[in-house]
Amino acid sequence: MDPYKFRPSSSFDSPFWTTNSGAPVWNNNSSLTVGARGPILLEDYHLVEKLANFDRERIPERVVHARGASAKGFFEVTHDISQLTCADFLRAPGVQTPLIVRFSTVIHERGSPETLRDPRGFAVKFYTREGNFDLVGNNFPVFFIRDGMKFPDMVHALKPNPKSHIQENWRILDFFSHHPESLHMFTFLFDDIGVPQDYRHMDGSGVHTYTLINKAGKSHYVKFHWKPTCGVKSLLEDEAIRVGGANHSHATQDLYDSIAAGNYPEWKLFIQIMDPLHEDRFDFDPLDVTKTWPEDIFPLQPMGRMVLNKNIDNFFAENEQLAFCPSLIVPGIYYSDDKLLQTRIFSYSDTQRHRLGPNYLQLPANAPKCAHHNNHHEGFMNFMHRDEEVNYFPSRYDPVRHAEKHPIPSTVLSGKREKCIIGKENNFKQPGERYRSFSADRQERFINRWIDALSDPRVTHEIRSIWISYWSQADKSLGQKIASRLNVRPSI
């Protein structure tokens, strides 16, 4: 089946106006009325159709990552990693794969300024010969929480107050005061890189630990990292106010204009590699999404590059309807037992079905570019042309068969059912190390941002004391400086 064979396209536009059903429209300016000044007639089908379509133009916006911009391009393998994975699109240097990327802010609504202090989404959809691979990450290599059970609460806390619809620091600091694992993420968010200059000048990260499997079935844990060839650039507070005040869509425009001018953005893709047999050797859990892997132990190894060389043709079709799901993987790449990744496997596809409908993977931006076949059919907005008589499996009348078997991780797991926190939390070491890596003026700006947040009049003495305690455990001098400026005694 060819999913594009019967697809409506502007390439087939008629030279004159029509209704959705193709009937010619001889007047698209005036309603049908009784006389020149009389009431409008309900029988004016063209008017009814036009208004009904307009009333339904908007779809539910993403609950997070609503504000975003997309572009198309290709991924090219530059270094051989076939010893690590049997993924076809990574089979050899020089292999190119078409892709589409969506950059985004996270918390605020569609149309909000792109200069707010907020993580940035960095999602890549690879259209491989073995199906789509979605690498759905952020510009920071860590996250606020490690268990998806807390994701709805976290988003609620970061979103505007449900009563006033204003994002307020006291709500954020209250929630995360219960989650010291968030400190590492805050050393990125409240750092100078918390407001990227634009989408072209920011890092990307797969954030989670993934698994690569080679033809022999050997598995390795990996972390994915995107590095822009033009470097990382950010906006300080005054710059963000100036840029955002002049153009609330500055990052979207910068991306579009750069590609249109032939100044194609490029990122190098690196991986960190760990043998799963060694995962217990460290003072952190390699599957803990609030931790980074030290680069002196796990150096960044180059594997490819991404070039964005084509703007999207239509914002709604290729940005609003573009749907990413961490569940979409290909042979040779697998998940890990990262608790947050495990919940995203379900949650993302579930929210796309709500937002776009059960057949969202038939939409052109989401459909695979390779031949594909299954019996998932019908449902709302199904436009796949099908003429089979057999819609079940197996059948002696239909030659379709199982695909060739590919290796998956063979780890043997055992344990009792339990709800608990991981053993190696170690919430303070890496945040402290990152803070101490800042220059003195960068540390000062970091402290000032925390002073500003903790000075919210609705932040209680108890919450301030908790945060000072947390930062003191990360770095004693940091906690003392915050406590001194807030006139609060550290609890440790």
Swiss-Prot record:
- Annotated GO MF terms: catalase activity; heme binding; metal ion binding
Q: Which residues form the active site?
A: H65, N138
Q: What else is known?
A: There are at least five isozymes of catalase in cotton.
- InterPro entries membership: Catalase, Catalase_AS, Catalase_clade1/3, Catalase_core, Catalase_haem_BS, Catalase_immune_responsive, Catalase_sf
- Subunit structure, briefly? Homotetramer.
Q: Which reaction does it catalyse?
A: 2 H2O2 = O2 + 2 H2O
Question: What's the protein name?
Answer: Catalase isozyme 2
Species this chain originates from = Gossypium hirsutum
- Where is this protein localized, as stated in its record? Peroxisome
| SUPFAM superfamilies to which the protein is assigned, alphabetical | Heme-dependent catalase-like
Gene this protein is translated from: CAT2
